[in-house]
Regions:
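Low-complexity basic/metal-binding stretches
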Residues: 194-204
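GHKL (Bergerat-fold) ATPase N-terminal catalytic module, capturing the glycine-rich phosphate-binding loop
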Residues: 1-176, 180-181, 189
Length: 204
């Protein structure tokens, strides 16, 4: 198991994001589904170019609720990641936009400047979650699965995962203030607004 620190210099990044985007908390749904769709599209391109074995299964993205565990799970069978890629794209790059936000827009009043200038992406999950976990496995042959976990601080853990198939599963452990998103009707409303309702699955 590897323990590390997110490569950011402002430890107050997540509290600032939460403050600025509080009224837009549901944007995490759009961002994470979009990321999942992108992962599938990337795999399709690699397969078309002969750089990946064609998929023998239908491509799918799903959003599910587990009310008992108080979590929302976003899953896809796209390109996936290995441990090195998780380290690069999640522990480093995903939070760089947030740091830029702190440096450039902390004293400004228009949150739309942030939304328009930087993709909220992965770290928007911390608008509603106390902890985020990732189980992922790369499309690459003989690749080992990876498991990443972070509670919203600058510390995270990265170790070998348990995922047996290609793709990524992101679990958001919803905080007390955001339990409204554990209601199927609420999540359905958000997905409908972003024309993503076909991805919904309830494990209530």
């Amino acid at each position: 198991m590897t323990k590390g620190t997110l490569e950011i210099h402002s430890e107050n990044i997540l509290p600032i994001i939460k403050k600025w985007l509080y009224s837009d908390r549901d944007i995490f749904v759009r961002e994470l589904v979009s990321n999942a769709c992108d992962a599938i599209q990337k795999f399709k391109i690699l397969a078309d170019q002969g750089q990946a074995s064609p998929s023998l299964e239908d491509f799918k993205v799903s959003v599910s609720i587990d009310k008992e565990a108080k979590k929302i799970v976003f899953s896809d069978n796209g390109i996936g990641m290995d441990a090195e890629e998780v380290q690069k794209y999640i522990a480093q790059i995903a939070f760089s936009g947030a740091e830029d936000f702190v440096q450039k827009y902390q004293s400004k009043n228009e949150k739309d400047q942030f939304i328009g200038h930087f993709g909220l992406g992965f770290y928007s999950a911390y608008m509603v979650a106390d902890k985020v976990e990732i189980q992922t496995r790369s499309y690459k042959e003989n690749s080992k699965p990876a498991f990443w976990s972070c509670d919203g601080s600058t510390e995270y853990t990265l170790e070998e995962g348990t995922k047996e198939t290609r793709g990524t599963e992101i679990s958001l452990y919803i905080n007390k203030e955001s339990e409204e998103f554990l209601e199927p009707s609420r999540l359905k409303e958000i997905l409908k607004r972003y024309c993503l309702i076909r991805y919904f699955k309830c494990l209530c």
